[in-house]
Amino acid sequence: MNNDKAGKNLTKEAPRSPKTRVGNYVVLGRTYDKCRALLWGDIGEYHFDCPLDNMLFGFKGVKGDDFKAEVEKGASDTEMAQWLDTHGEKKTPEEVKAWSDEMMAANPYENPEKRDWFVEQVSVYNLDPKTTTLFDWLDVDDKESCAMASA
C-alpha cells in the first residue's frame, strides 16, 4: 500500500481522462483521482460515486463506499485495479477490454432518454452530438473548466 495520502486539487486541475486505462479499465483513473480528492484534496465541482463512476462499479458489482474504503487505506491506482479484479463479479480480461472499448465508443446521443441533455452539453463547445463520444465531451469540458478556473 502507498502511504501517500494526498489528493489533487480538482479546482485547479482535472482528474484523469476517462479514456485513461488503469489495469485495462477505462474510468478507473478518473474515479480514483476524484476519490482521493474527496478524501485528501479538493474535489471542487466534481463528484465521486457519480453516474460515470457507477458504470464502473456496476460493471464489477462493487459499491462506491467499498472502493472509497480501499482508497482510504492508501491503495495506489494499480492496487485499485487489482482490487477490482478480485472483488465483485469475476470478469475475464476479455470482458474488461470489451466493456472498456464499449465505454470508449459510448455516445449519449444514441439514447433517446439522454439525447436532449447531451445535445445541450456539447453545444456549449460547438461539438457535433452525433459524432462526439461521452469521453470526448468530458475531456473538452475538463479542459475548458480548468482554463476558466485558472483565468
Where are these regions (language model features)?
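Polar/charged low-complexity regulatory segments
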Residues: N2-I43, M103, N107-A151
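Generic structural signal for well-ordered, non-membrane alpha-helices
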Residues: D33, V62-D65, E94
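Amphipathic alpha-helical packing elements
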Residues: D42-L84
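Amphipathic protein-protein interaction modules
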Residues: F67, V71-Y125
